[in-house]
Amino acid sequence: MADADAQRQAEEDANLQLPPYPHPPPFYLKFTTENKDRLDEIKKEDGIDTASDGGKSAQLSTEQILALPTELRYLIPPEPPADTEEFNVFGTINQLKDRDTFNGTMEYISQALAKLLPDWKYEQLYPTTDASNSASSTLDRQRYLFRFLRSILVAYIELLGIVAINPTDELKDDKLKDILTMVTNMHALINEYRPHQARETLISEMERQVEKKKMEIQGVRKMKERVGEVLEGFGREIPSEKAEDRTEEAAVTSEEERKRDAQRQMWQAMDEMLSQ
């Protein structure tokens, strides 16, 4: 008996067809016109004007929501999460409102180098960009990047001179802090190019797709011309009505040969088109 049940269960599992996409949650069936009208009536009884709040249910208190029938509670959207509420994505803790990841990175660097470079803090050495500024007053990031690069080279040469004279000199740490500050400022400026990089990447990808489509269209046109030439050749090979003096057997034989030749030419043309 157990074997028969197991076999029947195995057959049912084998015949079970899973949908390609998951089904929607069952409570979507509660979103009906009747339930919405019932909810509007309850709101009016509680003194909530649905016309003024656009039909939103945020003004219902917790007690009022719990007093509603179960099928009407689904029509009330939950409160949006707070900006500081954390959630996990692929093992990384995130917030609804983006964190200042750059300042967090600078704090991490400061803590990691606390023993080597105590009291080092990130200091922004370039003016802050303002979205309200005009295009003429936009920050010239390239100029500041070159400035930082030259300053890093000069500071590095000075650091070599200090270390060559006295490796334990305290000025060494000051130069290292200056170099680290300028490097982090360059890093911050380079990060501001990310939107530009994303835009240029999108433009490049779209141009590549346009060129690909143009090549495909050109290939289709070449195939069309080739097929037209083959069909035109077939038309020239159709026997004329002046061949009535031929015997019936010779006509049948020549017609079969022409069909074979036409088929061979067609296959040859298809091979040429597919090989392109």
Curated annotation (Swiss-Prot):
Keyword set, alphabetical order: Activator, Nucleus, Transcription, Transcription regulation
A Pfam family: Med7
Gene Ontology cellular-component terms listed: core mediator complex; mediator complex
InterPro entries: Med7/Med21-like, Mediatior_Med7, Mediatior_Med7_sf
UniProt feature, compositional bias: Basic and acidic residues: 1-11, 234-263
Molecular function per GO: transcription coregulator activity
Single biological process term from Gene Ontology: regulation of transcription by RNA polymerase II
Record's keyword annotation contains Cell cycle: no
Compartments reported by the entry: Nucleus
Stretch list, region Disordered: 1-27, 234-276
Protein task: Component of the Mediator complex, a coactivator involved in the regulated transcription of nearly all RNA polymerase II-dependent genes. Mediator functions as a bridge to convey information from gene-specific regulatory proteins to the basal RNA polymerase II transcription machinery. Mediator is recruited to promoters by direct interactions with regulatory proteins and serves as a scaffold for the assembly of a functional preinitiation complex with RNA polymerase II and the general transcription factors.
Self-association state and partner proteins as the record states: Component of the Mediator complex.
Family indicated by similarity: Belongs to the Mediator complex subunit 7 family.
Record-given protein name: Mediator of RNA polymerase II transcription subunit 7
Organism phylogeny: Eukaryota, Fungi, Dikarya, Ascomycota, Pezizomycotina
